[in-house]
Amino acid sequence: MLDRSQRGSRTLTLIVALAASLALAGPAGALELITEAESRLPPALSGMPRGGITLGPGIVVVTPSPDRDVRAPFAVKVNFRPHGGSKIDASRVKIIYLKRPAVDLTARLKGAISEAGIDLADATAPPGTHDIRIDVTDDAGRTKSAVVSFTVVK
C-alpha cells in the first residue's frame, strides 16, 4: 500500500506524462511533423547530391502546395510513381527535414508511408518555411529525391 506522499508523487508523474503526450499530439490529435526546436535549427547548406542518369521513381507532391501557405493542421499527400515494371520499396523511403543537423522524420511518418506514397491527413509544424527532402528507392535500387518546400502561417 502506498502512503500519501507516494500516491501524490505517482499522481503528479501520471499528470505530467499525460500532459506531455497531449502536447506532442498537437491540435486534435494531429501528428507533429516538425517540432518548434527543430524549426529553429539553422538551414541546411544548399545543394542536393547528384546521382547518375537513371529512371528512378517519380515523386508527385499533391499537398502541401509550395505556392500556397498552409495552416496547421494540414494534409501531407505525396504520390510515388514506379517506372519500368519496378515497385517502390516503402521500407527504403527516407524523409529528411533540411536543417543543420538534418532531422530524419522517417520514423515519425512510418504509418503514413506506403508503396503508393505518403498519406497523412493531419500534420502540424511551427509557422515558417520548411524544406523536406523525400528519397524514394525502387526494387531495382534506383533512387530519386525531391524537395518539398511549404510555408505554415498562424
Residue ranges and their predicted role:
Residues T13-A23:
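Bacterial N-terminal signal peptides
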Residues G29-F74, R81:
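Short, compositionally biased P/S/T/A/G/V-rich stretches that sit at domain boundaries
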Residues H83-K94:
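Solvent-exposed loop/turn segments flanking beta-strands in beta-repeat/beta-sandwich domains
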Residues K110-D119:
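Aromatic sugar-binding surface patches on proteins
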Residues D122-T129:
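Surface-exposed, short loops/turns at beta-strand junctions within beta-sandwich domains
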Residues K144-T151:
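Edge beta-strands of extracellular beta-sandwich domains
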